[in-house]
């Protein structure tokens, strides 16, 4: 699974650092456990209802994106949804994709800390 999905959800810097760990000759591919969380996520994510009343959110919301996410990143959709959230802050991490904590942990942590500091008690 990781050999197929990783290039779609990780950014170039992470892929370059981890390239030697993928597509190895001795890799054994086994079916996913149907009781696992990742199996449930992958098999049901297409049925999720994302049509939520974002306009009614009263708390501050942080939207952190990585433009190299080849599955979920759609700039138009991000702009449309962000425009519907009253108290939104957006941050795009330019070298990242979907797996922000794994790809750029320190930078992602700084974004979260800055957001937390911006909140009024």
List each model region and its residues.
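Active-site acidic short loop of glycosyltransferases
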Residues: 58-59, 87
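Conserved alpha/beta-hydrolase catalytic His-Asp/Glu region
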Residues: 1-55
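Alpha-helical elements of Rossmann-like donor-binding domains used by nucleotide-donor carbohydrate transfer enzymes
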Residues: 4, 24, 40-44, 76, ...
